[in-house]
Amino acid sequence: MAKQKFDRSKPHCNVGTIGHVDHGKTTLTAAITRTLSTKGWADFRAYDQIDNAPEEKARGLTIAISHIEYQTETRHYAHIDCPGHADYIKNMITGAAQMDGAILVVSAPDGPMPQTREHVLLIHQVEVPAVVVALNKCDMMDDEELLELVELEVRELLTKNSFPGDEIPIVRVSAIKALECGCGKRECEWCGRIWKLMDAVDSYIPIPPRPVDKPFLMKVEDVFSIKGRGTVATGRVERGIIKGGDEVDLVGLHHEPRKIVVTSLEMFHKILDSAEPGDAVGLLLRGVEREDIERGMVLAKPGSIKPHINAEAEVYVLSKDEGGRHTPFFNGYKPQFFFGTTDVTGEIHLPEGVEMVVPGDHVKMKISTIYPVAMEKGMRFAIREGGKTVGAGAISQVLS
């Protein structure tokens, strides 16, 4: 069957659901698709279709990231359902990096919980610019004063993490009630609130300025081979434009950059003439074997980015209260550096006169990684240890 072409008539925006486990992120995602499907703007995706990565079934946890496509009257959205559980925060970091805005789901009966706080901190670290709040399970709360208290608590949490807590839209919903009803009418008590939420997303989450004119860059998230056609690399275009026939550099990890050709592009299983920043695409590549490319490498305009092992960085070390280390670290500390899609072990070199770094400090440091990673000034990374984020940084200067 011939593939349809991807429709670009509406501006595109990447959003995602975040929040504490069992507060209703996946149910809300299902309710959004159900409501929008009544206008033909989405394919309804049931809870278990969204919760569909293989390892999740056993534990009932959303581990992988589900990509859902839908439209409103004015926009086209790619929606990711982020994992809610702290064990899978690594995926959250790769996923949150793909969001122009977040829908923070908070259960009204429970209020903000530890993972709510962790996710809000994380989206601030990875610079997700805007948040809309879905106060879920409001069918279980009939006390107006209690609801107002929960809203206040959510606003305080957002303000504490440098978001404009007083301005952020908070929409009271019941994902389960909207899903059960499914009429999709604006005047319906519960379906209408899903429309109200999407109106808030449409108006409050800005369409990001796309860095179209910069040199092409895409971090490789996944790789697979298609029999008889070649190797496909998937990821999100960070900047620049890529077209079929373009030559790119494959950069990072184990060998010198090598030139390969992009033969064709797909998004949501539809053929694309060209891909722009923000597009989550699969690139069919010529001149590279499946085993020569892996998650953590980047595809870039030839000559535009180089692999490095040494850099200077500005780093904020999370305090104990923010979920960071409880004790200081010293020169020669060897954590993992998380660059976009991969963890790389490395070493920290503190400036002269700095004996140690205490949780809560902001410090300039040199970092070195055990193998080359595509790095450039301004690139953000996380510092991780034992499965948790202990610092957030940005490259201030590439050294070698």
From Swiss-Prot:
It comes from the Bacteria. Keywords: Cytoplasm, Elongation factor, GTP-binding, Hydrolase, Magnesium, Metal-binding, Nucleotide-binding, Protein biosynthesis. It catalyses: GTP + H2O = GDP + phosphate + H(+). The keyword Phosphoprotein does not apply. Its main location: cytoplasm. CDD domains: EF_Tu, EFTU_II, EFTU_III. Residues 136-139 are annotated as: G4. Residues 10-210 form the tr-type G domain. GTP binds at residues 19-26, 81-85, 136-139. Mg(2+) binds at residue 26. GO terms for cellular component: cytosol. GO terms for molecular function: GTP binding; GTPase activity; translation elongation factor activity. Residues 81-84 are annotated as: G3. It is found in: Cytoplasm. Residues 174-176 are annotated as: G5. InterPro entries: EF-Tu_GTP-bd, EF-Tu_GTPase, EFTu-like_2, EFTU_2, P-loop_NTPase, Small_GTP-bd, T_Tr_GTP-bd_dom, Transl_B-barrel_sf. Signal peptide: none annotated. Residues 19-26 are annotated as: G1. GTP hydrolase that promotes the GTP-dependent binding of aminoacyl-tRNA to the A-site of ribosomes during protein biosynthesis. NCBIfam families: EF-Tu, PRK00049.1, PRK12735.1, PRK12736.1, small_GTP. Belongs to the TRAFAC class translation factor GTPase superfamily. Classic translation factor GTPase family. EF-Tu/EF-1A subfamily. HAMAP family: EF_Tu_B (MF_00118_B). Monomer. This is Elongation factor Tu. It comes from Dehalococcoides mccartyi (strain ATCC BAA-2266 / KCTC 15142 / 195) (Dehalococcoides ethenogenes (strain 195)).
